[in-house]
From Swiss-Prot:
Protein EC: 4.2.1.19
Pfam families from the UniProt entry: IGPD
Native source organism of the sequence: Lachnoclostridium phytofermentans (strain ATCC 700394 / DSM 18823 / ISDg) (Clostridium phytofermentans)
Enzyme class: lyase
Protein name in UniProt: Imidazoleglycerol-phosphate dehydratase
Any one GO biological process: L-histidine biosynthetic process
Pathway: Amino-acid biosynthesis; L-histidine biosynthesis; L-histidine from 5-phospho-alpha-D-ribose 1-diphosphate: step 6/9
Length: 196
């Protein structure tokens, strides 16, 4: 089974190419033009064992909003494409990730029904050159373009870098679990017989 995706998306605001292998080893080549976002997405790929290449040319002369949001949209599209008909996947995944004083919970249902429940208390406006309010926008974009029910909750912590990094790593671990193949599952894991 080849669980890969290649996506290209060009607008007046961003030009993005992305390649994803869900069954990789964590090799990442990320170039968004935003150093902090690159670091977070590299952590996502590494801890989820996803091979991921992202090249983004965005209107950073305006601000980082379009680049962050559109990167999330394309990553969500790639996840959806790589999962194809979701045959044999576990569908659900969750992870409670500690990082020093920080504890973050992430839970996923690859149901085809998009929803984001994001609960975090970030106390600074920026991390590097990235506005912290865009962390939520990134995960919102992924959840809606992937058709994913996504819950991310900060349980503890006060260091903003640790909180956001723990979110990305917890998301990676939960997605690795949810997208994993279970040989006991015949078809899709739904009494309806379909998962969109």
């Amino acid at each position: 089974m080849n669980r890969t995706a290649k996506i290209s998306r060009k607008t007046k605001e961003t030009d993005i190419t992305l390649e994803l292998n869900l069954d990789g080893t964590g090799i990442a080549e990320i170039e968004t033009g935003i150093g902090f976002l690159d670091h977070m997405v590299q952590s996502f790929a590494k801890h989820g064992f996803f091979d991921l290449t992202i090249k983004v040319k965005g209107d950073l002369y305006v601000d980082s909003h379009h680049t962050v949001e559109d990167t999330g949209i394309v990553l969500g599209q790639a996840i959806k494409q790589a999962l194809d008909e979701k045959i044999g996947i576990r569908r659900y995944g969750s992870f409670l990730l500690p990082m020093d004083e920080t504890l973050v919970l992430c839970a996923i249902d690859l149901s085809g029904r998009p929803y984001l429940n994001y609960q975090a208390q970030l106390t600074c406006e920026k991390l590097g050159y990235m506005d912290t309010e865009l962390v939520k926008e990134f995960f919102y974009a992924i959840s809606y373009s992937a058709g994913m029910n996504l819950h991310i909750k900060q349980m503890d912590g006060n260091n903003n870098h640790h909180i956001v990094e723990a979110m990305f790593k917890a998301f990676a671990k939960a997605l690795d679990e949810a997208s994993g193949i279970d040989p006991r599952i015949q078809g899709v894991l739904s009494t309806k017989g379909t998962v969109e």
